[in-house]
Amino acid sequence: MRLALLWALGLLGAGSPRPSPPLPNIGGTEEEQQASPERTQSRSLENQVVQDSPPINLTEVLQTGLPETLRIGLELDGENHILELQQNRDLVPGRPTLVWYQPDGTRMVSEGHSLENCCYRGRVQGRPSSWVSLCACSGIRGLVVLSPERSYTLELGPGDLQRPLIVSRIQDLLLPGHTCAPSWHAFVPTEAAPDLLLEQHHLRRLKRDVVTETKIVELVIVADNSEVRKYPDFQQLLNRTLEVALLLDTFFQPLNVRVALVGLEAWTQRDLIEMSSNPAVLLDNFLRWRRTDLLPRLPHDSAQLVTVTSFSGPMVGMAIQNSICSPDFSGGVNMDHSTSILGVASSIAHELGHSLGLDHDSPGNSCPCPGPAPAKSCIMEASTDFLPGLNFSNCSRWALEKALLDGMGSCLFEWPPSRAPMSSLCGNMFVDPGEQCDCGFPDECTDPCCDYFTCQLRPGAQCASDGPCCQNCKLQPAGWQCRLPTDDCDLPEFCLGDSSQCPPDIRLGDGEPCASGEAVCMHGRCASYTRQCQSLWGPGAQPAAPLCLQTANTRGNAFGSCGRSPSGSYMPCNLRDAICGQLQCQWGRNQPLLGSVQDQLSEVLEANGTQLNCSWVDLDLGNDVAQPLLALPGTACGPGLVCIGHRCQPVDLLGAQECRSKCHGHGVCDSSRHCHCDEGWAPPDCMTQLRATSSLTTGLLLSLLLLLVLVLLGASYWYRARLHQRLCQLKGSSCQYRAAQSGPPERPGPPQRAQQMPGTKQANVSFPVPPSRPLPPNPVPKKLQAELADRSNPPTRPLPADPVVWRPKPQGPTKPPPPRKPLPANPQGRPPLGDLPGPGDGSLQLVVPSRPAPPPPAASSLYL
């Protein structure tokens, strides 16, 4: 492999290193300590490109400080490429904890140690599918992937800065081969499953769930004494740890999983556990120390032990399947089998994958892996054939999705504390102070809400599309459900209304009942025996008959046990604890969804005179999986009893009842040991009852209020009508006359023909007697209404009757001429005046007074 020509250019905003506590000197020689260049305050240079500016020597760059952006020109196989790099700030969130030990055994803790951010991520210019992972902590080490067929390692020691960079193809690396027993995986999809696990910035702007949300694994790496002796300079050990963590983060990013290094512990004086070449024994010892010593003082999601000790057999690591977030089993042991960080990082990624629920890839083409042979090597393959895996297969993607939907990984949604303040840098995919968003490089930013040049929200945008509480650049309202519950032990989460991110995942606390009383919640999962069988054997699977289960697990062999001892032998269960041992199921699929059937045993048992056919299997999960599939903690094993530590124990040991008593009967305990109050009760102790403010209650109150108003209006109208009726009875016909003038209109009756007096002609107009019910209002023109307003009112009571009957007289003089002003025309559609309805049959008996009657009232002129 020819040596590459390297230059660095385009440096921007390099931050000066912050002072850190002195690191221990573990015995490195003076020459080794002088080999690492000192860090000095860096200087800012103007933007430069290859075509317009001369290259800057790499030695000068590394000796003057590490910039936040770096562009490296590189020749690979005769082709010139430019690496565009940004510091990976998600790798070291906040200021991690460093732990080492003095000769007298005193533990030294540097909480919030200022690690210089010397690791970069990026891509090759002009190659969208490429990626680069590189650390410049001490020299140069990294990985460049142009395509699945072309991958290269970069390496340059701290004392070799004047020499050319060494570039090697992945296929040329000679790493010690390692293998796990082949897992003839039966989960072979018949058709391509949808790719739901894309990187966050490629997601559609839809409501997201646990599958598509970005998860983060808070990782602690523990270096045993043999690893410390291999790298006696503590800074060198720290740099190597950072390089391994960077590759882990790079491997898991396509699965929407980030890896953050929150702590490093170095056993600088002696090993704190008993070391063993048997990885199962070593794992058991390490997990016990993690549970009792490490976890209480340094919270994390997974701990990985790195040792130089050679393991017996071909294995280079071991972990427990589907154990992430478990305080008892979330960890692994790994052998530092190569000077290349790529091989070590790939091995740790393999064991961490087991903790996340990933099984070994099936041989053949059932689990596609990018790249042709011999480059085809995925991380979860049982055997790497001397080539480190660089990618996860589609089978690994589907397995992670299934594990998440089954309730695994509640701790992965809690992001570490905020990072230490650093200078802002637009384009590093981290929202720095002064920025509103950051979607990365211009060619990878797909966020329509974010301006990738300024890292500010675009006009009209309220948020960046980097979380489930932002849709179409608008914040979802407070109370909008952003994460659905995955099982009985999960609680829904809701947007707060002021952030695009969904709150951390909250689950029911340990000991809360679930699955209709079949189990209780443990570590955020509902440990129903039926569901465990269906997760292993598919739909329709059920627990085996009690006699078959007890017989198998009390024998203590590969077909049934309560687990393995540190020496690797199977441990039989006590009869009381049999249900807490190995999973014993019936029905379902012929082949399991996890692992493969290595052997099968059938036996006929007799119980109460009845023969029972029992069948047991020996599942092969791979040599690097420490334990068989045992019943999960929290599985019900009797009335008031659950499995704790593979023993059937009282559920009260989990403390759920004690925690629930703080909620005063109006709530349950969540995973943070806080009360999750029932609706209508206020936290934190669920003692105060809230006012009913739900939409249903509000609607009922409004309906009752409206009904009350209607009742009052009806009562008022009835009272006024009764009062009006009584007044009319007291006043007599005047009330009736006023009703004829101003009462509401009534439907007119049939027209009646008016009677004529004998010897008279038909009168043009007759005066109607006041009707017994009001007449319809007469349409009077406005102009005439104004003239009538000046005239006198009609008499208030009728004229007295005259006993003298008026007799007809001879026809008098002719009628006077009609008025000069024409009468108003009848409204269209109004019946003739003579057809107006009258009371009774319409006949009119006229009584004439003895003296001439006064002229008709002014109002009657309307009818002349």
Curated annotation (Swiss-Prot):
GO cellular component, alphabetical, reads:
acrosomal vesicle; adherens junction; cell surface; extracellular exosome; extracellular space; membrane; motile cilium
Instruction: List each copy of the Disintegrin domain by range.
Output: 423-510
Task: Provide the active-site residues from the annotation.
Answer: E351
On assembly, the entry states: Interacts with ITAGV-ITGB3 (vitronectin receptor). Interacts with SH3GL2 and SNX9; this interaction occurs preferentially with ADAM15 precursor, rather than the processed form, suggesting it occurs in a secretory pathway compartment prior to the medial Golgi. Interacts with ITAG9-ITGB1. Interacts specifically with Src family protein-tyrosine kinases (PTKs). Interacts with SH3PXD2A. Interacts with ITAGV-ITGB1. Interacts with GRB2, HCK, ITSN1, ITSN2, LYN, MAPK1, MAPK3, NCF1, NCK1, nephrocystin, PTK6, SNX33, LCK and SRC.
Compositional bias (Low complexity) spans? 826-850
Q: State its role.
A: Active metalloproteinase with gelatinolytic and collagenolytic activity. Plays a role in the wound healing process. Mediates both heterotypic intraepithelial cell/T-cell interactions and homotypic T-cell aggregation. Inhibits beta-1 integrin-mediated cell adhesion and migration of airway smooth muscle cells. Suppresses cell motility on or towards fibronectin possibly by driving alpha-v/beta-1 integrin (ITAGV-ITGB1) cell surface expression via ERK1/2 inactivation. Cleaves E-cadherin in response to growth factor deprivation. Plays a role in glomerular cell migration.
Q: Known PANTHER family for this protein?
A: ADAM A DISINTEGRIN AND METALLOPROTEASE DOMAIN, DISINTEGRIN AND METALLOPROTEINASE DOMAIN-CONTAINING PROTEIN 15
Q: Which organism is it from?
A: Rattus norvegicus
Tissue specificity field? Predominantly expressed in brain, spinal cord, sciatic nerve and lung. Expressed at lower levels in all other tissues. In the peripheral nervous system, expressed predominantly by Schwann cells. In the central nervous system, preferentially expressed by neuronal cells.
Extract the InterPro entries matched here: ADAM_Cys-rich, Disintegrin_dom, Disintegrin_dom_sf, EGF-like_dom, MetalloPept_cat_dom_sf, Peptidase_M12B, Peptidase_M12B_N, Reprolysin_adamalysin
Q: Which SUPFAM superfamilies match?
A: Blood coagulation inhibitor (disintegrin), Metalloproteases ('zincins'), catalytic domain
Transmembrane segments annotated in the record for this chain: 699-719
Q: Which regions face the Extracellular side of the membrane?
A: 209-698
Q: How is it modified after translation?
A: The precursor is cleaved by a furin endopeptidase. Phosphorylation increases association with PTKs.
Gene giving rise to this polypeptide: Adam15
EC numbers for this chain:
3.4.24.-
Signal peptide limits: 1-17
**What spans are recorded as compositionally biased (Pro residues)?**
768-780, 810-825
Q: Which residues are glycosylated?
A: N57, N239, N391, N394, N608, N613
Please report a single Pfam family linked to this protein.
Pep_M12B_propep
GO terms under biological process: angiogenesis; cardiac epithelial to mesenchymal transition; cell-cell adhesion; cellular response to phorbol 13-acetate 12-myristate; collagen catabolic process; immune response to tumor cell; innate immune response; integrin-mediated signaling pathway
Q: Which GO terms describe its molecular function?
A: immunoglobulin receptor binding; integrin binding; metal ion binding; metalloendopeptidase activity; metallopeptidase activity; SH3 domain binding
Protein name according to UniProt: Disintegrin and metalloproteinase domain-containing protein 15
Motif Cysteine switch located where? 178-185
Q: Which cysteines are joined by disulfide bonds?
A: C325-C411, C367-C395, C369-C378, C482-C502, C659-C669, C663-C675, C677-C686
This protein's membrane topology, according to the annotation, is:
Single-pass type I membrane protein
Q: Where is the EGF-like domain?
A: 659-687
Name the segments for region: Disordered: 17-49, 738-864
